[in-house]
């Protein structure tokens, strides 16, 4: 990824956190965190990685709400960041958070077995 794409991704991450936390009022969108934004080299596509608090059903509802609000979110980003063309947003779940929690629980389980 180019240096410019990295900078745009970081700025988008900051702005998306604000937009999703303060501007959106969709009840389907629960408590979520933008963990990363990867912007393509030509600045046309942005993969937005999110982490959602809740079960699988809540995660799916959040994704549906984000898909419905994608146009509004993109226009807000366009108003806040000066780019010739605002990147197309693609929302994806960040599996690394769940993976990290799973590893942590396995290590804790091993530690309790060692102390017994």
From Swiss-Prot:
It is found in: Cytoplasm. GO terms for biological process: maturation of SSU-rRNA. Gene3D superfamilies: 3.30.300.20. GO terms for molecular function: ribosomal small subunit binding. GO terms for cellular component: cytosol. Coiled coil: none annotated. Its main location: cytoplasm. Disulfide bonds: none annotated. The keyword Ion transport does not apply. Keywords: Cytoplasm, Ribosome biogenesis. Pfam families: RBFA (PF02033). InterPro entries: KH_dom-like_a/b, RbfA, RbfA_dom_sf, Ribosome-bd_factorA_CS. The keyword Cytoplasm applies. Monomer. Binds 30S ribosomal subunits, but not 50S ribosomal subunits or 70S ribosomes. One of several proteins that assist in the late maturation steps of the functional core of the 30S ribosomal subunit. Associates with free 30S ribosomal subunits (but not with 30S subunits that are part of 70S ribosomes or polysomes). Required for efficient processing of 16S rRNA. May interact with the 5'-terminal helix region of 16S rRNA. Belongs to the RbfA family. This is Ribosome-binding factor A.
